[in-house]
Design a protein with these regions (language model features):
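Glycine-rich beta-alpha loop segments
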Residues: 1-88
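Solvent-exposed alpha-helices and their adjacent loops that cap or buttress functional pockets
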Residues: 22-25, 79, 97-100, 117-120, ...
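Short, solvent-exposed amphipathic alpha-helical segments in soluble enzyme
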Residues: 49, 79, 141-145, 171-175, ...
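Short gly/pro/ser/thr-enriched loop/turn and capping motifs at secondary-structure boundaries
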Residues: 92-97, 134, 162-165
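Active-site/ligand-binding-proximal alpha/beta "capping" segment
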Residues: 109-161, 207-210
């Protein structure tokens, strides 16, 4: 192993160690994914704020990627509700900035470690509209659930006007035309909803806050 790889390995170990030490006493919460580019005027920004506020009032720790846009709305909602508002940020050369509405936060160098803790610290996944980063996070959770690498959890996509075409593509291309996922996988692993009431009902059906 060369010096560069040794340094990289040391840094990876340190990030994992710091994450476990920082969050070891936290209950499993709800992780909410979404775009860093969502404006405060967007209906989804307002919905994400309302959802996280209500979840925090119900006792759920709320997690986001710790940045701006939907992530800021998520953290601000939980923060304003005086709940546990966790932000797991990432160092990027542009676009990603820490928001100030967290009760506990950490900034990562490595995406895969950040994604590990966003999964490890959560027991349910909510996916608001977003781009490639949001879809990467959503697909990872779907894959982990399908392959039984994580315990059963709800994965909830928010906004039929945004995600309906994605669900249709899964059905038409993945299930029917190519059979690259099981015919019942979509129904089994993914939920598509519009309202926060639907989200909270799904969460309540899987066993409470802890």
């Amino acid at each position: 192993m060369n010096k560069v790889d040794k340094k990289r390995l040391k840094r990876i170990k340190q990030e994992f160690s710091d994450g476990f030490r920082l969050f070891t006493l936290y209950d499993k919460g709800v992780v909410i994914f979404g775009s860093a580019r969502t404006s405060p005027e967007s209906k989804y920004y307002k919905q994400a704020y309302d959802l996280s506020f209500r979840l925090a009032k119900l006792g759920y720790p709320v997690l986001s990627g710790g940045g701006m846009g939907t992530m800021k709305a998520v953290n601000k909602g939980a923060y304003d509700a005086k709940g546990k508002s966790i932000g797991l940020n990432i160092k990027l050369p542009h676009e990603q900035f820490n928001n100030k509405y967290t009760t506990k936060s950490m900034t990562f160098n490595y995406f895969f470690i950040r994604k590990f803790f966003l999964t490890y610290l959560s027991r349910a996944t909510v996916v608001f509209p977003g781009g490639w980063g949001t879809m990467d996070e959503a697909y990872e959770h779907l894959t982990l659930l399908q392959t039984k690498k994580i315990k059963q959890r709800p994965i909830i996509f928010v906004g039929a006007d945004y995600y309906k075409d994605v669900f249709n593509w899964w059905e038409d291309v993945l299930v029917v035309k190519n059979k690259t996922i099981g015919e019942k996988d979509i129904q089994k692993y993914a939920n598509l909803v519009n309202s926060n009431e639907e989200i909270i009902a799904i969460l309540n059906n899987v066993g409470g806050k802890k």
